[in-house]
Structures are given as structure tokens and as C-alpha cells.
From Swiss-Prot:
Residues binding ATP: 244, 249, 268-273, 311
Domain KH: 48-109
GO MF annotations in UniProt: ATP binding; ATP hydrolysis activity; mRNA binding; RNA helicase activity
Keyword Transmembrane: no
Family: Belongs to the DEAD box helicase family.
EC number(s) per entry: 3.6.4.13
Main subcellular localisation: nucleus
Placement of sequence motif DEAD box: 376-379
EC supergroup of this enzyme: hydrolase
Record bears the keyword ATP-binding: yes
Protein name as it appears in the record: Probable ATP-dependent RNA helicase DDX53
Compartments reported by the entry: Nucleus
Length: 631
């Protein structure tokens, strides 16, 4: 019986059983599975028969690794599922997935085995005879150290690189550079470019490529400067009625049109969507092969929420460039209907990671033809823990694609994501990469208690003017529903919007808010990203968010494209850990800081220092004293 992982419970072989098998996929299904364990393994391409071959029983541990580490890494890197079933002298290996990934996993396993066999042949026979056999005739207290063979990682890496080359060898080349600088743009002096960027929200650009830096393209201040070679796109822009590009669009377009990967860091409402969509249209229509020959979508836009996905799809439909077809894929809609829509042929897929990953794993969508990738609102993606799904999705997207990433903030986690998925990118950001709330918004901070929140909110609502439109942020769904009910009972028009709301109810609430039928929209952060609301006068933070990035994003709903407005934020003792960060944000935006907030921040700092001293003075192993009072 197998003995490579002693920390798992062993099972005796039963002639009636199919055999013990190692069956791991990510963090689920790990451990032993027999005939009553995992039924019907699933993986990408699981409709295809598994790739089966045999290995010697003494090589099973080499493939599994300590605590299953190697087999888990293999499955993660190849997007496959691997089963190993013990036999009398040989173990049967079954690999589930698509054809390329199965071959890649088999090649990696064979490399591991060759490396181990080479190591064994070089080992001394005397040394081998003197060692206690692992897993045999051991007492309960026996401890045996197993020599870890030297890994020939260069050979493994070379095998993986070769497999990757074979995987993408049949795909046509990608054309990326379509930019021709206009005469007006080329005539801009260096000082004019510097002044333009400073006057337009202090836009900053940088080249993140290592080594010799490239020249940052000059901004295209007019639509015709960016798209003079594409009259059909200019006609669509004129038809929609946009007068001039936003600053972020002016700077992003010449970079993307040159085929350079780009990171855009800017708040919601700065025109990020069109900054990547319009170059994407040109990219799709200008590839060496026709759309019919492409055999799949050419552009993929990943968004964290269905609201943002619907907004992006609406923008695609609005400009309708050369008949490009787009589809929106997200959870909550009919899955079979989405599969049917994809099968009819699409050029652009706008999707949330969860639903797209589901369709990908069941071979319902072909992503090999994607040459233009957008990761929209990357910071929100990470907040919602979508990174594992993103990694799996990108296993099936060609590595020589062009990639654009947008984010409202620039924390270390987003930087790491950018390093993983973008190649030699440039970055364009508004203002400073440190968190800064827009200075066109008057930020009012009220230090209060949980009990006083309702009364303060009621007072605020009663003092609203007829033209005011308020987004009210809360932390929980039931609070949104309770507040909405209370306001409507009083004859105050309000709607709640959260993750449990039906899609039709969400769309109706947003439309009612835009049209002015309701004046107060009460929402949670999870659905707020992607809401296309341009005439908000007030943001009311009933509950303070979990991190300061979200606060900046909330306030940004008012300050879109330089508009002015007011935010009101209630902060209580339970939010005291955020007080110091909030003060920094207020200082950077030249806002007044309430004395109560300063006191809260100082008190929290003192409490933390006291707790730290107590922890350091405590003896090792000594627990903090607990006191219990009996009534």
C-alpha cells in the first residue's frame, strides 16, 4: 500500500475496490479517495478521455511530493486534474484536462521521474543498504529522514517552455502597433506636454520597462488626433455627441495604439472604459486574419461585478464599431443561454471571473483567440478574491497578447498582479500614487456613536434640497433595506441596492436614480463599482468602509471629471483604527480635520502601544489573565 504521506490515514487495499488514489485539485478534494470518494473528476477539458499511463510504484512519492506539494503544483500550473491509482507493481496515472495541458502535465511527470532515476543510479549501494526503508517496519516513535534529491530545475523549466511553444505554435501572429502621430500632436513642445499634464488633474506617466526607458507618447488632445486613420470610429463618436476626450483617454490612447501594455490608475468616472475600448476596437479589426478566420473572441474584458460588466457592454453597443459583437457573461443569468450566445460567434467577451472560469472549465468558451485583454478594476478584483479564477482563465489566453489593467488604487497587491500579467508596461495615473481623495469634494467627518447614526442621518435627509442626489453607503444588506423602508414610509423616495437584489430590480433602481424619480440610493460597496452615475451631489457614508482605499473610491463618485460636491462620513469608535489613515487623506486633499478625529487617532495609537508592551512583557507561554464575574 502507498506510504509516501504518513500524516494521512492509511487504508488497506481491498480487491473489490478500484484502488486508493491520490486526487487533488487546488485546495479541494485533497486526501485519499476510493470507490466512494470523488465520483466523476472534473477539470478543464474533462469531457475528453483522460490521458493514462503507468509509473513504477516507487516513483509515486516523487510525483506526489511532501504533503502533496508537487502534485498540487503540477495541477495548478497545467490546469489539470491528476489521479494516481496504486497497482501491484505499477501505479496508473490518469490526467484530466484539455489535450495540450495533459501533454504538458505528462512531460513534467516524466521529467521528475527521470531526475529521480538519475539520482538513484548515482547513489552509493552501500549507503542505500544502510538506510532504514521508509514506511516499512517502523515503530510509532521511529523518525526517519528521507534524503531529498537534487532538482534539475533547468531541465524542468526548459520542458515547460518547450511545451508552451508547442501549445501556441499554430496561432497566427498578433499585430499591435496602429498609431500614427498627428501633426498637431507632434508639434507639441516638451513644455506644452508638461503643462497639459499638470493642468489636467496632474496626470503622471512612467515607463516600467527595465533597462533603457522608452519615450512616453504625447497626449492626443482631440479625437481626430488619436483616430484620424479611422473615420468610422470618428463618426460613431460624433453620433454619440462627445465633445472632447477626457485627460486619461488623451494620454492612454497613443500608448495602447502603439501596442504597449498599460496600467491606468484613476478613479471611477475619469473615462477609463473608453480609454481601453476604442483602441480595442481598432486592434480587433486590424488583425492579419479576418474575424471569421479567428474562430473565437478577440477581446476579453474582466470585471469584478456584473454592474461594471453591463456598463462596459453598454459602451460597446453605443459605439458599435464595424459590427463588432459583444456579450456580457456573469453569474445570475441563464447559463445555457450564455453558452448558446457564445456559440453563435462573438468578438468581445465582457465577463466576471467566476462565471467565465465556470464556462472555461467545461470547454464552453474558447479563449485561445484572445489577443487583447483588459483587467478592469484590478483592486476590486483582489478585494473580492478573484485572483485564483483570473490565473486559471489566463492559462488559456496566449502570452503574446496586449494587456491593459485599470485600478482605482495602487497598493502592493495590485502592483504584484501587474507584474504577473503585463509585459514591460507603461503606467498612467492621476495625481499621486499615494491615496488622494479628489480635492473638488468637501469632506465632512462626524465622530459619533452607533446609536446616534439614525438620528444624524434623518437630520441630513430632511435638510436635502430638491436637486440633491445622494449615494448612501452601508456595510450590510439588511441596513440598506431598513433605511430604504424607513425613508419610503416617511414619503422620502429611496431605493436599496445590494448583492441580493434581483438584476431587474438593480437596473430599475439605477434608472430611477438617474432620471430623478428617487433621490437617495442606498448601496453596499460590492455593487457600487461600475455604476454609471454622473450627477451625484452627495456621498453619505453611513458606515465607514473596511479600508481607506474604499473611502477614496466612494468620495470619487462626486468628483468625476472635476465636478464639485459634498461627502458626509460617520465614524464611530469601532472604526478608530482607520482614523489615522483618514487624517492623511484629509490633509492631502486640503480638508479640515475635526479635533475629535485627531483624539480618536491618538487614543487608538496609545492603546496599540500599550497592548504591544503587555505582549512583550508577558513570559513565553504565559496567557493573558482573564477575569470572570458571576452574577
Amino acid at each position: 500500500m502507498s506510504h509516501w504521506a504518513p500524516e494521512w490515514k492509511r487504508a488497506e487495499a481491498n480487491p473489490r475496490d478500484l484502488g486508493a488514489s491520490w486526487d487533488v485539485r487546488g485546495s479541494r478534494g485533497s486526501g485519499w479517495s476510493g470507490p466512494f470518494g470523488h465520483q466523476g473528476p472534473r477539470a478543464a477539458g474533462s469531457r475528453e478521455p483522460p490521458l493514462c499511463f503507468k509509473i513504477k510504484n516507487n516513483m509515486v512519492g516523487v510525483v506526489i511530493g511532501y504533503s502533496g506539494s508537487k502534485i498540487k503544483d503540477l495541477q495548478h500550473s497545467t490546469n489539470t486534474k491528476i489521479q494516481i491509482i496504486n497497482g501491484e507493481s505499477e501505479a496508473k496515472v490518469r490526467i484530466f484536462g484539455n489535450r495540450e495541458m495533459k501533454a504538458k502535465a505528462k512531460a513534467a511527470i516524466e521529467t521528475l521521474i527521470r531526475k529521480q532515476e538519475s539520482y538513484n543510479s548515482e547513489s552509493s549501494v552501500d549507503n542505500a543498504a544502510s538506510q532504514t526503508p521508509i514506511g516499512r517496519n517502523l515503530g510509532r516513535n521511529d523518525i526517519v529522514g528521507e534524503a531529498e534529491p537534487l532538482s534539475n530545475w533547468d531541465r524542468i523549466r526548459a520542458a515547460v517552455v518547450e511545451c508552451e511553444k508547442r501549445k501556441w505554435a499554430d496561432l497566427p501572429p498578433v499585430k499591435k502597433n496602429f498609431y500614427i502621430e498627428s501633426k498637431a500632436t507632434s508639434c507639441m513642445s516638451e513644455m506644452q506636454v508638461i503643462n497639459w499634464r499638470k493642468e489636467n488633474f496632474n496626470i503622471t506617466c512612467d515607463d516600467l520597462k527595465s533597462g533603457e526607458k522608452r519615450l512616453i507618447p504625447k497626449p492626443t488632445c482631440r479625437f481626430k488626433d488619436a483616430f484620424q486613420q479611422y473615420p468610422d470610429l470618428l463618426k460613431s463618436i460624433i453620433r454619440v455627441g462627445i465633445v472632447k476626450p477626457t485627460p486619461i483617454q488623451s494620454q492612454a490612447w497613443p500608448i495602447i495604439l502603439q501596442g504597449i501594455d498599460l496600467i491606468v490608475v484613476a478613479q471611477t468616472g475619469t473615462g477609463k472604459t473608453l480609454s481601453y475600448l476604442m483602441p480595442g476596437f481598432i486592434h480587433l479589426d486590424s488583425q492579419p486574419i479576418s474575424r471569421e478566420q479567428r474562430n473565437g473572441p478577440g477581446m476579453l474584458v474582466l470585471t469584478p461585478t456584473r454592474e461594471l460588466a453591463l456598463h462596459v457592454e453598454a459602451e460597446c453597443s453605443k459605439y458599435s464599431y464595424k459590427g463588432l459583437k459583444s456579450i456580457c457573461i456573469y453569474g445570475g443569468r441563464n447559463r445555457n443561454g450564455q453558452i448558446e450566445d457564445i456559440s453563435k460567434g462573438v468578438d468581445i467577451i465582457i465577463a466576471t471571473p467566476g462565471r467565465l472560469n465556470d464556462l472555461q472549465m467545461n470547454n464552453s468558451v474558447n479563449l485561445r483567440s484572445i489577443t487583447y485583454l483588459v483587467i478592469d478594476e484590478a483592486d476590486k478584483m483582489l478585494d473580492m478574491e478573484f485572483e485564483p479564477q483570473i490565473r486559471k482563465i489566463l492559462l488559456d489566453v496566449r502570452p503574446d497578447r496586449q494587456t491593459v489593467m485599470t485600478s482605482a488604487t495602487w497598493p502592493d497587491t495590485v502592483r504584484q498582479l501587474a507584474l504577473s500579467y503585463l509585459k514591460d508596461p507603461m503606467i498612467v495615473y492621476v495625481g499621486n500614487l499615494n491615496l488622494v481623495a479628489v480635492n473638488t469634494v468637501k469632506q465632512n467627518i462626524i465622530v459619533t456613536t452607533e446609536k446616534e447614526k439614525r438620528a444624524l442621518t434623518q437630520e441630513f435627509v430632511e435638510n436635502m434640497s430638491p436637486n440633491d442626489k445622494v449615494i448612501m453607503f452601508v456595510s450590510q444588506k439588511h441596513i440598506a433595506d431598513d433605511l430604504s423602508s424607513d425613508f419610503n414610509i416617511q414619503g422620502i423616495s429611496a431605493e436599496s441596492l445590494h448583492g441580493n437584489s434581483e438584476q431587474s430590480d438593480q437596473e430599475r433602481a439605477v434608472e430611477d436614480f438617474k432620471s430623478g424619480n428617487i433621490k437617495i440610493l442606498i448601496t453596499t460597496d460590492i455593487v457600487s463599482r461600475g455604476l454609471d452615475l454622473n450627477d451625484v451631489t452627495h456621498v453619505y457614508n453611513y458606515d465607514f468602509p473596511r479600508n481607506i482605499d474604499v473611502y477614496v473610491h466612494r468620495v470619487g463618485y462626486i468628483g468625476r471629471t472635476g465636478k464639485t460636491g459634498t461627502s458626509v462620513t460617520l465614524i464611530t469608535q469601532r472604526d478608530s483604527k482607520m482614523a489615522g489613515e483618514l487624517i492623511k487623506i484629509l490633509d492631502r486633499a486640503n480638508q479640515s480635520v475635526p479635533e475629535d478625529l485627531v483624539v480618536m487617532a491618538e487614543q487608538y495609537k496609545l492603546n496599540q502601544q500599550k497592548r504591544h508592551r503587555e505582549t512583550r512583557s508577558r513570559k513565553p507561554g504565559q496567557r493573558r489573565k482573564e477575569f470572570y464575574f458571576l452574577s
